[in-house]
Amino acid sequence: MTVKEIYGTDFPVILAPMAGITDLPFRILCKEQGADVMVTEMISAKALFYGNKNTLPLMQTEEEEKPIGVQIFGSEPELMGAMAHKIENKGFSYIDINMGCPVPKIVNNKEGSALMLNPELAGRIVKEVSKAVSLPVTVKFRKGFDDDHINAPEFAQIMEENGAAAVAVHGRTRVQYYTGEADWNIIKEVKKAVSIPVIGNGDIFTGEDAVKMREYTGCDGIMVARGAKGNPWLFREIKAALFGEKIPERPTEEEVISMLLRHAQLSVKYKGEKMGIREMRKHTAWYTTGMHGSSSLRNKVNQVETLEALRELLMR
């Protein structure tokens, strides 16, 4: 399959799945600012199987944010296939398999990035999911598990052999988490190793970074993660840079506050007032980084319980 057949565009700029961050409200904002493709937060195949009540909201989508992929994780091939089949008709454009999460409780269950230590099992998972669904199946993984197990190119080949339509590669090992610099060379190596589309991920914080990654690695698209936290405007900057257009001005403080308030309104709309406002505490910290008086503002936001109180606080 071509990049366009999977993602709907020739060089997709994708909002990476980030647990606890890339929920529906945030995805809508990023889409409005130019992100081409969304992915849900990661969803446990086991939780889906057991009907966990906290899992269903993670699959909530809106027409305006599409195309969107659903990301699942697990270590049991048959269960992964069955759960992928169960959710393939929920309006998603593709199924993404998480093989890059570095969090200890995931890794200790032999899930996420732990699968990079077991390429044979990882391949079986991709094979089962690919057999079970008619949607494209993609895989997100890392450079390797640690410096002694840097195997992304070989791992990508196994993914391709077992039916993956595309892969996304984060240029760090599991042991690195998000420290140090992302190794873009490994993305270039993966691109040479497979014939399926390769999405580059890691250290894209500006439009210039996106252009450099495209030119240096030859990747077929980019995935933006931490750079988007508190900064959905990054996508308009990236799109302008990729198209050789004038880079938009950075948002003013007034625009940041306006976006923060819109984010809060969406959060309350989809999660209810209590949960929606509490969710905004972490987002406020990201939106207001470097802003004059941000520390005091964050402390006050942490005490707020209603949308009206938040609005009054932000509009002072």
Give a label for each model feature:
Residues M1-T2, I6-D10, I14, A19, ...:
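Alpha/beta catalytic cores of nucleotide-metabolism and tRNA/nucleoside-modifying enzymes
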Residues S75, L117, P251:
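Residue-level signal for the nucleotide or nucleotide-sugar donor/cofactor binding architecture
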Residues V13-P17, M38-T40, I68-I72, I95, ...:
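Hydrophobic faces of well-ordered beta-strands that scaffold small-molecule active sites
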Residues N52, N118-P119, N231, G272:
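Short, solvent-exposed helix-helix connector turns and helix-capping sites enriched
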Residues L29-E32, G81-E111, E120-I196:
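Alpha/beta enzyme core
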Residues M18-G20, I43-A45, F73-S75, G100-P102, ...:
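Active-site beta-loop-alpha junctions enriched in small/polar residues
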Residues M1-V3, T9, M18-S93:
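Glycine-rich, positively charged N-terminal anion/phosphate-binding segment
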